[in-house]
């Protein structure tokens, strides 16, 4: 009987994102706090005689080697189980091109899933190394939880797990290219850089007010210039009661942190009149 395995693939938000400069390899040197939230893709991986096949409920994602999940399957099978194949079904719930690591989290789930499905017995360190070679966010998505990420995003330091109970996430009706945003980033134009030390102190103390107050993302400089609507969403989230609002990753998704469920529900209702993709989320634990 053919075995299959079902995994949850949580979205990622960046609670702070600083860029220290451009590296000799063309990547940017980052320092960012990444945090998983309970917006989930569902990944079903089934044994197959050979090859890799991807199907999805979404027409917005590729089902060939352009998909990071395909690349992840190709890498782990090629390295450790070259005679085996897989069929992968991606139930896509995370918005595409949104700064939420939707493709990366699917790839991480595929690495974990194939390791289990074919009893490969690979240790976390080996899986993380593989994940990092596929994409900058894939290692975090595999490790999960809350992490301070440096380098390209693959050098991870564990943070205490903290629950953020009410997050309103608004995905505007357009996409942004991560590569394009980084290409256009000019650090001399950034008006305010994150104080990651202050953020981490607030995180350690589980001080939600100062966690929110210290959220910053230098990539907003580029994304807001291209799409001023991002700044308008941020301002409106704060007007509706958010402690602070921030673009996640390279955008365009914007999240607001709320203390009270009632305020968060009202904000969701307000934004749902204008946007198709509005979510009330909390930390994924």
Swiss-Prot record:
Q: Which PANTHER family match?
A: 4-DIPHOSPHOCYTIDYL-2-C-METHYL-D-ERYTHRITOL KINASE, CHLOROPLASTIC
Residues recorded as binding ATP, renumbered to this chain, are 95-105
Kinase listed as a keyword: yes
Catalytic residues identified in the record: 12, 137
Instruction: Quote the catalytic activity from the record.
Output: 4-CDP-2-C-methyl-D-erythritol + ATP = 4-CDP-2-C-methyl-D-erythritol 2-phosphate + ADP + H(+)
Role description = Catalyzes the phosphorylation of the position 2 hydroxy group of 4-diphosphocytidyl-2C-methyl-D-erythritol.
Q: Look up keyword Isomerase and say if it applies.
A: no
EC assignment: 2.7.1.148
Q: Which family does it belong to?
A: Belongs to the GHMP kinase family. IspE subfamily.
The pathway to which it is assigned is: Isoprenoid biosynthesis; isopentenyl diphosphate biosynthesis via DXP pathway; isopentenyl diphosphate from 1-deoxy-D-xylulose 5-phosphate: step 3/6
Q: Name one GO biological process term.
A: isopentenyl diphosphate biosynthetic process, methylerythritol 4-phosphate pathway
Q: Which UniProt keywords apply?
A: ATP-binding, Isoprene biosynthesis, Kinase, Nucleotide-binding, Transferase
Extract one GO molecular function annotation from the record: ATP binding
Q: What class of enzyme is it?
A: transferase
What protein name is recorded for this chain?
A: 4-diphosphocytidyl-2-C-methyl-D-erythritol kinase
List the NCBIfam families hit by this protein, alphabetically: ispE (TIGR00154)
Q: Which residues form the signal peptide?
A: none
Per its UniProt entry, which superkingdom is the organism in? Bacteria
Which is one Pfam family of this protein?
GHMP_kinases_N
